[in-house]
């Protein structure tokens, strides 16, 4: 593999609970197994954890994640999802792990930007005019490096009512902005509890499997699949590869 290839793991939708128990939506052992598999692979430059860390808004759920993060040796970036208590998460998780919308992180040939789509108390996502302005300002002024955008809600329709109802509601405003910049190469999101990859114009949109459980693809009703995993991204100079890893 090329030396300048950036290797990323995406972990999403852990839904941890206050106790280390196997509830239907809080899978402590799943999360442990995912991080163990990532560590054993020994190949990643960065890990993005794309929201819904907690399922019950408890301090202990974030403490569980923190104990797992302490065992990792590569850079880790954590963002909130609609199930998270952002203030509590920011209190428990050290700043070095938190990805701020105010900053642009550069690594090799890419810039990485976090867009906060979370609306307090709501399932859907939304970007305010201020959020959109800040985001476009970053794209306009951060140079010519290729861009990777990280967020929780899906910013592109999946043609599935259950998730398109609760996606980033003003996704068209977001898409309008990124279409102005041909160096936006990758948008990583969570929320949808499965592995999706969609190409739109010059940009690849991609989600990882949930750590807790999957919602079966292409079904009109919610059908739970008791499997879990994470997703690898290989960012080469001229192209991007993805690889979904199923633990179970």
UniProtKB/Swiss-Prot annotation:
Enzyme nomenclature, EC number: 3.1.4.-
Cofactor section: Fe(2+)
Residues reported in the UniProt entry to bind Fe cation 2: 52, 82, 152, 191
Transmembrane segments: none
Pfam families, sorted: Metallophos (PF00149)
Family annotation (Gene3D superfamilies): 3.60.21.10
Source organism, top-level taxon: Bacteria
Binding site for Fe cation 1: 13, 15, 52, 193
GO molecular function list: 3',5'-cyclic-AMP phosphodiesterase activity; metal ion binding; nucleotide binding
Residues that bind AMP: 15, 52, 82-83, 193
CDD domains per UniProt: MPP_GpdQ
UniProt KW Metal-binding keyword: yes
Cofactor note: Binds 2 Fe(2+) ions per subunit.
Key words of the record: Hydrolase, Iron, Metal-binding, Nucleotide-binding, Plasmid
SUPFAM superfamilies for this protein: Metallo-dependent phosphatases
Cited InterPro entries: Calcineurin-like_PHP_ApaH, CNP_phosphodiesterase-III, GpdQ/CpdA-like, Metallo-depent_PP-like
Enzyme class (EC, first level): hydrolase
Family the entry assigns: Belongs to the cyclic nucleotide phosphodiesterase class-III family.
PANTHER family noted in UniProt: CYCLIC NUCLEOTIDE PHOSPHODIESTERASE CBUA0032-RELATED, PHOSPHOHYDROLASE
Protein name stated in the entry: Probable cyclic nucleotide phosphodiesterase CBUA0032
Source species of the chain: Coxiella burnetii (strain RSA 493 / Nine Mile phase I)
């Amino acid at each position: 593999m090329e030396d300048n290839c950036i290797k990323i793991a995406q972990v999403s939708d852990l839904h941890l609970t206050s106790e280390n128990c196997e509830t239907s939506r809080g899978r402590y052992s799943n999360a442990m197994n995912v991080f163990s598999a990532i560590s054993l692979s020994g190949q990643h430059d960065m890990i993005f954890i794309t929201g819904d860390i907690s399922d019950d808004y408890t301090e202990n759920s974030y403490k569980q994640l923190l104990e797992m993060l302490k065992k990792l040796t590569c850079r880790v970036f954590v963002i909130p999802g609609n199930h998270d208590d952002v203030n509590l998460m920011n209190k428990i998780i050290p700043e070095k792990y938190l990805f701020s919308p105010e900053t642009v992180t550069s690594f090799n040939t890419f810039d990485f930007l976090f867009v906060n789509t979370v609306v307090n108390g709501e399932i859907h996502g939304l970007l305010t005019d201020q959020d959109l302005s800040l985001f476009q300002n970053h794209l306009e002024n951060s140079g010519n490096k290729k861009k990777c955008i990280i967020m929780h809600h899906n910013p592109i329709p999946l043609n599935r009512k259950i998730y398109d109802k609760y996606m980033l509601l003003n996704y068209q405003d977001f898409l309008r902005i990124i279409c102005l910049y041909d160096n936006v190469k990758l948008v990583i999101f969570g929320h949808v509890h499965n592995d999706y990859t969609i190409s739109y114009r010059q940009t690849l949109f991609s989600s990882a499997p949930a750590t807790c459980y999957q919602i079966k693809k292409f079904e009109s009703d919610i059908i739970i699949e008791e499997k879990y995993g994470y997703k690898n991204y290989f960012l080469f100079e001229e192209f991007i590869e993805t690889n979904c890893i199923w633990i179970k």
